[in-house]
Every structure is written in C-alpha cells, then in structure tokens.
Amino acid sequence: MASVQQGTPAETNGAASANTIGVENPATGDLITTIPVLGADQIRAMAGRAREAQPQWEAIGFDGRARVMRRAQKWMLDHADRVIESVVQETGKTHEDAQLADLGYTVSALGFWAKEAARYLADERVPSWNNPVAAGKKLIIRYAPVGLVGVIGPWNYPIANSFGDCIPALMAGNTVILKPSEVTPLSSLLMAEMMRECGLPEDVFQVATGDGTTGAALIAEVDCVMFTGSSRTGKAVMKAAAEALVPCYLELGGKDPMIVCADANLERAANAAAFYSMNNGGQVCISVERCYVDESIYDEFVQKVTDNVRGLRQGEPTGVGTVDVGAVIFPPQLDIIDEHVRDAVAKGAKVLTGGHPRPGPGRYFEPTVLVDVDHSMKCMQEETFGPTLPIMKIANAEEGVRLANDSNYGLQASVWTSDVEHGEALARRIQAGVVCVNDAQINYTALNLPMGGWKTSGMGTRHGSGGIRKYTKIQSLLITRRALKREPFMFPYTARQTRLLRAFFKLVYGRGKRD
C-alpha cells in the first residue's frame, strides 16, 4: 500500500502539502502510507474547479448521471476484493463487516439513487384553487441543485458513510468535495479513482485529504455541508456553517437503547444483542449501546448473551472468516471505552466477560458484557462506541421506555416482543429518529426510509426524499397564462374597488362555520 496515490494532480492542485499525516493499520499498528494535509488555498482552488464543472454535470440530466452511477456499481462489484481490502487495512475491521456495509450498502445506494433521484426531484404541480387570487395560475415546485456540496465523513465506515453521502448529492446535479477522516482516507481516494474510471467528468467529485483545519476550510467554500461524526464536533461544524451562512446536515452520536420485553423471542433477542452491540467492533452510530431486559427473563438472557460474546474471536483480520471482532479504529476511542468500563466497575457494575484493552500489537478492546449497571454510569449515558454491552434489569416495558428516553441522544432504538402491536405502540413513545421492532440497524438498508436523529443526535435525514432534497434549493414558479391588462386590486385605488374587494372576501371566506 506504500504506492497509494493521494489523488491526481487536479485534486491536490499540483503540489503536495508541507504537512502530511500517517495512515496506520489499527489491527497491527503498522504505517500504511502518508497523505497530505490540504490547506485553505488548495481547498479554494478545488472549489473553484468544482464550480466550473457543475453546470455541465447538471446539464447531462438524471439519465446521464445515472449511467455513471450504474457503471460505478459494476466497478465496485468487479473490484470487490480490492475495495474490501482497502477498508480492512485502514480500519482493522473484519472482512465481513467491510463487505456487508462498506461494499454492500454502497452498491445498493448507487443503484437506488440512479433509479429514484429523478422521481424524488421531479417538478411538483401545486393546486391553485385554495386562493381565488391565484386561481387558474400554474404553480410548480422545482428542486434545483445547491451547487457545491461538502461532505465530511467519519472513520467507522469510510465508504458507506463518506462516499455514500456523496451519491445522492451527485445525482441531484451537484459537484462534491469529500473530506474523509484523516484516520481512514484511502478508501475515499479509491472511490475517486473509481469515479474517474467510470466516466465522471473532471472535478465533479474530488477528495480533500487532511485534518480538522482542512474541514474548516471546506465549510467556508461550499454551498451545503453534510457531516457525520460526534456531537461535539458536529456543534463546531454547525457553528462554522452558520458563519458561512450555508445549510448543514448532521448525523451525530447515539446511545441506542434495546428494550427486551417479557414475551420476546429470547433466542433471537440474545443473538441480536450480541451482534448489534459488537458488529464493526461496536463502532456503529446505531449500535446497541444499552440494553434493558424484563426481570422475568433477565438471568436467562444475560447468560445467553454472555456465552455468545465470550466465544467471539478478536484479532487481525487476515482473511474471510478469521475473526468476529476487529480493532478499535480511532486511537483516542480506546481510552474512552476503557474509561466507561472502569467508571461502571467503580460504581458497582460487574464485568461478565472482557473488560480490558487487549495487550499486543494493534488497538483492541475485549468484547465486554456489563451487568448491575444504572444511569449514574457513563456507559449508560455517554456514547461508548466500542465492543461493550451494559445490560440493566427492568420491572417492565414501561420502565424500559422511561429509561430509554432518559438520554440526550435520540438516534435509534429497538423493542423486542412477540406482541408486535404492543411493540409498535412502545416504539411510538420512544424519543428517537428510528425505532425498530424485533430488529436493529437493518433500517439503514431501507434506502426509501428516512434515517436521522432527534435531540443531540443530529439534524436532517439520510435516505428517502429528504435524503436527496437536502442537496437542492426549492424554487417556486407561478405562471399566468391568460392575463388581464389590469388586475382589480392594482393602482389606482378607488373607494368602489375597495368595497368590491371587501364584498368578495366576505363572499369567499365568510361562509365558514362559527364557533
């Protein structure tokens, strides 16, 4: 991987930055390569080229843009091993996690937006009958591209949650500059290579490598920002976007609760709890981060989950099927995970399995199950983002809902019960942007279903109509086809004209029911 290219000369403005960042393999600690930290002048030059390229990209229409996306879909499948290996090397995640999300989600999204973008962004006719003054006029809502979109991606899914956000923005007719995480930039550069090979015009999609200063410079140059990351960084992004007076959309932290009712399918719920808390090393924005279990099934549930988690294989992913849980991708995250576990133990929690950073090369935290937890502990209140599962005993589902809502976060939640009608009723009371019944995380694959956070978990949505319309400007059109030389309300004002208009208002609006 030492020969990885940091973009084309066009993407780096023909010169490497004086500053570089090393990209490591978290599974081994080995240096893969270095990437340049692009500065404000380079970002400004990239933005200028993107703005020049945008009108032509918009002009080729939905069909032309869709052809590029479908070619990219085929390219990813034809080069699946290379795509997966790129993700695995810079994240230390398992081949299976990389295939399921970074590859599987992205090829699905390329096809979905290629097919659905035109429908979501088609002109909408609006009825004019509700106001006599506008009666007979042609009213249209039009969705126009914002122009240049800046996407600031996270490190946990360097393709799915970085390039994945670029796809609808591109299909809407925008140009895009993607600033990937400095920890995992290589897969984004691979996506830039893919798009060039698939016929995307020059400068329509560019990758800006660098650190937080690069992201700040990007926000100052674009017309719209999409950010995925922590709530703390999201607030800084929102502040910078406000200074630039550009819209921003945020997918931020989560502390997703799982409520297991007394009548739940215990085997399925236990398997799901183990998987959806540990997949991708627990580094999933919609990971199960806290679990509330009815006291009548608590002991059996805890035993099943603990047995499952204790048997998970962790280590360097040397091939398919070699490990179940990979590395901790972001270096500071290892300390956060450890801090949350130590805080819980100090306050009375018990570790049933795991509980420690794993010694040796690479960054790992043992898959961990905690019990005897409560809401005084960080592991139940703050985003852990690691392979841990705190399980709390509850009296009933009502207590579970109350505790689920006792959080600053509201990204996702799940309810597990054999009574799906009761489960849906509980779901509607949980303060989260997405709630699943007898499932978790799978909603992310339903690309026609909006996904977004409440509370401090974000603003705006991915997927569905809102997932592409956020990258547009709404233009309203009113067209008068048969016009009078002079409307009755135009100058000059006369007493007779005023009386007639008053009578007209009374005739039209005065027949409503009186309280």
Task: Name each model feature, range by range.
Residues 224, 232-374, 437, 498, ...:
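ALDH superfamily catalytic-core signature
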Residues 128-268, 322, 394:
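Rossmann-like NAD(P) dinucleotide-binding subdomain of oxidoreductase/dehydrogenase enzymes
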Residues 18-21, 288, 411:
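Short loop/turn microsegments at loop-to-beta-strand junctions
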Residues 29, 65, 87, 110, ...:
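Residue-level signal for inorganic ion chemistry
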Residues 54, 58, 73-76, 80, ...:
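Structural signal for hydrophobic packing residues in well-ordered secondary-structure cores
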